[in-house]
Amino acid sequence: MIAKPPTSTYFSVKVSNILPYGGPDSELGASLRYLSQRFAMPLPELKGTLTDIGTEELNHLEMIGAIVYQLTKDLTEDEIKEQGFGDYFVDHTTGIFPQAAAGFPYTAASMQVKGDPITDLHESMAAEQKARTTYDNILRFCDDYDVKDPIRFLRAREVVHYQRFGENLRLLTDKLNEKNFYAFNPSFDKKCFKNELKKKKK
C-alpha cells in the first residue's frame, strides 16, 4: 500500500506542472467550445445539453485551478528552483494562469465551432475522449490521493459527457428526413427535419 505523501513533495509539485488548466484539451477549452457551439443547435434539447455541460466544465476548471494553487502556494524559493516550477513562477508567481502542460498559453485555435450540429457534436465527443486520455496520463504520474481522487472524478465526468453527446447526435439524426446526414447542414438547411417535410406535404 502506498503511503499518502504530503502535498508539498517534489512529486506533487511536478504534477501541478502538467494539470490541464489551459491546454488544448483543458476544461477551459471545453467550456468555451460547448457554450459557443450551442447557439447553432437547431433543437432545444441540444442547446440544453451543451449549456449544461459547458457550465459544468467551468466548475471543473475551478477544481483544476484549486488543485494547482494548493500544490504550489506554500513553496519555498529552494523548492521552486529544485522542483521545476521556476519558469512558471517568474511569469505568474503562484497565480493560476491558463496554459498547457508544455507551458504555452491557452489559445482558441485549439477548439472549433463549425455551425454544423453534426460536425460540432462529433467535435465535442472527440474533445471528451481527448480529455479522458489526458486524465488517464496524469493518473499514471500521480501518487497523491488528494490529487488522484478529484482527477478520477473529472475523468468519470468526461465519459458521461461523451455518452450524452452521443445520445444528442442520435436524437438529431433521428429527426432528419434523409438518411444521408452529410448532404446538408441541419443548422442552416431548415427543411431537413421530418416535421418540416410533413408541413411541406400539407
Q: What residue ranges belong to the model's regions?
A:
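Non-heme di-metal
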Residues: 1-202
